[in-house]
Amino acid sequence: MSSALIADNIAKVRETIAECAEKSGRLAADVTLVGVCKYFGEEVTRMVAEAGLLDLGENRPQQLWDKALSLDTLPIRWHQIGHLQRNKVRRSLPFIHLFHAGGSMRLLVEINKEAERVQATQEVLLEINGLKLMHLEEK
């Protein structure tokens, strides 16, 4: 995969986002494009970031940690997508711009506890299923 092909594909997706945003009366700037790099190694991930796509998602914490450390000279905003085990929150938090995995109260409490410990504010997307709201109730 070449840098030129990656940059061209990103540009095409951004054009589509701009067209759709305009049709819906929104601004393209209000839409965040997140490139999911879970099947790609460091080299391709670097090319994506160098092409200007700086919001990158990974669903495997170990790979996210490794990529974040090896690509730390690039201003990448890392997104943890998918499930995250509570025991990996402490190690993950320093790298994560946005958690897309707020599906359980126990995980949310752990993220909040760790964020408070390091005096940070952590953004999280909540997953809410109307049929399963009892999972968010405190017991």
Which functions belong to the PLM regions below?
Residues 1-139:
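Conserved alpha/beta-domain cores
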